[in-house]
C-alpha cells in the first residue's frame, strides 16, 4: 500500500529530523507465500520525495527474475535504485548461505558492526566455490532460466485451465488454494508424496485464514513438461478426493486413533 507507506514516511521523516537518524524502507522482491512481486518500482519512484534508503530481500527473485537473473529489481527496471540488496544461495543456487550487495560504505559498516558477522564462522570454502560456479552458470547459460520459465508457465497455465486458484503470482512460486482443514491438508500432502511422488509444502492457519489450504509448488529447470503434466493430473486427483470427503474421513480416523 503505497499511500500507507507515504504516511509512515511522513512520520518517520519527522522523527529522523528530531533524532538525526535515517530511514530504511524494506520490501521483499517476491513474497514467498503468494508469489507476488513487491511494488519496488512504485517505492523507488517516491525516493525523490523522501530521504530514505531502500533494502530489498529478494530470496525468491534472485536467479529467476530479470534479463540476467539479477532479480525483481532488474525485472522491474529499478535495480540501481536499490541501496541494499539481500538474497540467499538456498533458492535458485540450491546451496547454503546468503549475501548482501551495497555501496562500500554500507558493507564496511555491516562488516564491523553486525553481531552475526563478528561472532559467526566464515562460509565454508566449498560452498563459496559452488556459489561462484553457479553465478558463472547464471551468466553463461541463459538457457537454464529459459527452461525454468517454460516449466513455470506450463504449470501455472495448466493449473488455471483446470480451474485451480493460483492467485496473482508473478514468479516461479506457484500457490494453489484449496478449501479444507489442517488434518485434511496433512493427509493430502502425504497422498501427493506417496502416491504421486510429488513433494510440496503446505501452508495453513494462522498464516492464512481458517478453512483454506495453500499448497506451494516451485518448478525447477530439471523438471520436464512430462513432469508438469503428471503434476497437473495428480492435482486433479487430490482435488476430487478432497471435495469428495475422502481426506476428511481419513483425517478423522487418524485423529480418533
Annotate each PLM feature.
Residues 194-199, 235-243:
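A common structural junction motif
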Residues 1-2, 15, 19, 23-27, ...:
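Pyridoxal 5′-phosphate
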Residues 16, 23, 86, 120-121, ...:
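Short beta-strand
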Residues 51, 71-89, 108, 112:
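Conserved active-site segment immediately N-terminal to the catalytic lysine
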Amino acid at each position: 500500500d503505497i499511500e500507507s507507506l507515504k504516511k509512515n514516511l511522513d512520520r518517520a521523516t519527522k522523527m529522523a529530523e528530531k533524532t538525526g537518524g535515517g530511514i530504511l524502507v524494506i520490501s521483499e522482491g517476491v513474497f514467498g507465500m503468494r508469489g507476488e512481486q513487491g511494488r519496488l518500482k512504485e517505492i523507488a519512484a517516491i525516493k525523490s520525495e523522501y530521504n530514505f534508503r531502500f533494502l530489498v530481500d529478494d530470496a525468491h527473485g534472485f536467479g529467476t527474475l530479470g534479463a540476467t537473473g539479477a532479480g525483481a529489481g532488474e525485472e522491474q527496471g529499478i535495480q540501481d535504485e536499490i541501496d541494499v540488496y539481500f538474497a540467499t544461495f538456498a533458492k535458485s543456487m540450491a546451496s547454503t548461505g546468503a549475501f548482501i550487495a551495497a555501496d562500500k560504505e554500507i558493507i564496511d559498516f555491516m562488516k564491523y558492526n553486525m553481531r552475526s558477522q563478528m561472532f559467526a564462522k566464515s562460509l565454508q570454502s566449498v560452498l563459496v566455490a559452488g556459489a561462484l560456479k553457479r553465478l558463472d552458470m547464471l551468466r553463461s547459460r541463459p538457457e537454464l532460466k529459459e527452461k525454468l520459465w517454460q516449466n513455470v508457465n506450463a504449470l501455472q497455465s495448466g493449473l488455471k485451465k483446470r480451474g485451480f486458484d493460483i492467485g496473482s503470482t508473478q514468479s516461479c512460486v506457484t500457490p494453489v488454494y484449496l478449501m479444507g482443514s489442517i488434518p485434511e491438508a496433512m493427509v493430502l500432502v502425504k497422498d501427493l508424496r506417496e502416491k504421486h511422488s510429488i513433494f510440496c509444502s503446505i501452508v495453513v492457519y494462522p498464516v492464512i485464514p481458517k478453512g483454506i489450504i495453500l499448497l506451494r509448488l516451485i518448478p525447477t529447470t530439471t523438471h520436464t513438461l512430462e513432469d508438469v503434466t503428471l503434476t497437473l493430473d495428480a492435482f486433479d486427483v487430490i482435488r476430487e478426493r478432497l471435495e469428495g470427503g475422502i481426506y476428511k474421513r481419513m483425517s478423522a480416523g487418524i485423529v480418533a486413533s
